Amino acid sequence: RDILRHEAVKNAVIFCNRKRDIAELIKSLTRHGFSAVALHGDMTQSARLEALQRFKDGEVPLMIASDVAARGLDIAGLSHVFNFDVPSHAEDYVHRIGRTGRAGKSGRAFTIAASKDDIKYIGFIEKLISKPIPQITVVDGRVVESGAKSSASKPTISDGKAGAKADAKTDDSHASENS
């Protein structure tokens, strides 16, 4: 949430790996004053189209999505992409962050890496894209370290456009455990 506020997000797609996490994240964001819609494969086609249209029309600034939104969606002027979960397939990362900065426009992408598995997947992504992903570490909402590689145990990774790390994904009592 702090990143959303700090970045002055106009509109953003926030990717989660599991539908259950999408629902939990929407509840958490809503409790903290954010407006968001879901987009995932278990929704009917009409529900997906309605959610997407509300997002494109600017009625709702945040779309919390599964990888169903990572390919084939062209959202003009998308300011940010957040990977709430690091994708387990490096190619999915490339497709996710490709939703922003399209058609010569600028955009920013952030990936929250909070586990050893996340760091492992980041390594696969860096190998695929043939470059290191800049990292910054945030503790209690403050940047404590930034650079190409962080020695912190839970760095947050960016795609080279920007980066951030939350000490925990949410501070709500129901925060999800990702597997």
Label the predicted regions.
Residues D57, L128, T137, G141-S179:
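Basic Arg/Gly/Lys-rich low-complexity intrinsically disordered segments
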Residues R1-K149:
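Conserved helicase RecA-like core
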